[in-house]
Amino acid sequence: MLDKIWYRSKPNLLSRVLQPISLVFIDIANKRKIKQQLKQYKSKIPIIVVGNISVGGTGKTPVVRMLAQQYLAQDKKPAIISRGYGAKADNYPFEVTSGTLATQCGDEPAMLFDALQAQVPIVIAPERVQAVKYIEKNFPDTDIIMSDDGLQHYKLARDKEIVVVDAIRMFGNKLCLPAGPLREPIERLKEVDQIIVIGNCSDKDKELLKNYKNVTYAKVVATEFVNILTAKKVAKTEFNHQNAIAIAGIGNPTKFFKTLEESAINITAKKVFKDHHKFTQSDFEGIDSDITVVMTYKDAIKCKNFAKANWWYLDIALDINV
């Protein structure tokens, strides 16, 4: 319901009614920001925060993955910190290892660890400062730390801020919670170092973005399909015009389905779950065992223990237009 209210070009009646609450939200958020900045922790290791000013999935994690791969290619030693949304670790800070389950560390850290083939230390903690201090102590030769989300976590000083924007949703009605989808007023974009817009913007939105510096456009590119059970990789054309069921438990499933359609797969059914859904075998009851199942990388990480031979995830990369 809120999506229908938030993602209109102009505020509707309900958004107007909620605006006074939004003003209270902004006031509380500003006071919290000032309070956190007074006790801000500054690491000797450079820190890049990759975040957003709106709720929901915008593509932060693929950007973090891309940056980590770039640093590795330059023979640098990056590390990643995350809140670990939905994580249930016994203690924090918690380092992700090869035996860590997504339920312990959260979906995104588990996916990043797998995608980066354990080459990058990944540490989670609700208080990101704890994660940074853990890296300083245990990985002192780290060249750079990337924070997956955490733009509004002002207890941690940062050397660079990158905001990721979904080109389809953009900033909705441009109002703050609960009247709109923004965590901070849109003016916050004037303070960040870089804005990465993922997807195809309308001409109107491109005009809006001209008000901000260092705007980079990117698009999600399907690279290959990976078998969840065997890790076998096949070309993205492997399933052209074949029937498949698409599964998505992410913040913005529409983007995933669109990418699949662009890959010429014949999607016969779509099953959508809430973001960070904890998958079990029962979620797949009623699905014909002979039909191909395709899902996101993030969802696949949670289905490895009960995956079937014809279950695949679509891996992606970002094509950056600098």
Curated annotation (Swiss-Prot):
Its EC number is 2.7.1.130. Pfam families: LpxK. Keywords: ATP-binding, Kinase, Lipid A biosynthesis, Lipid biosynthesis, Lipid metabolism, Nucleotide-binding, Transferase. It comes from the Bacteria. Pathway: Glycolipid biosynthesis; lipid IV(A) biosynthesis; lipid IV(A) from (3R)-3-hydroxytetradecanoyl-[acyl-carrier-protein] and UDP-N-acetyl-alpha-D-glucosamine: step 6/6. The keyword rRNA-binding does not apply. The keyword Nucleotide-binding applies. GO terms for biological process: lipid A biosynthetic process; lipopolysaccharide core region biosynthetic process. SUPFAM superfamilies: P-loop containing nucleoside triphosphate hydrolases. ATP binds at residues 54-61. It catalyses: a lipid A disaccharide + ATP = a lipid IVA + ADP + H(+). One of its GO terms (cellular component) is plasma membrane. One of its GO terms (molecular function) is ATP binding. HAMAP family: LpxK (MF_00409). Belongs to the LpxK family. NCBIfam families: lpxK. Transfers the gamma-phosphate of ATP to the 4'-position of a tetraacyldisaccharide 1-phosphate intermediate (termed DS-1-P) to form tetraacyldisaccharide 1,4'-bis-phosphate (lipid IVA). This is Tetraacyldisaccharide 4'-kinase. It comes from Francisella tularensis subsp. tularensis (strain SCHU S4 / Schu 4). The lineage of its organism: Bacteria, Pseudomonadati, Pseudomonadota, Gammaproteobacteria, Thiotrichales.
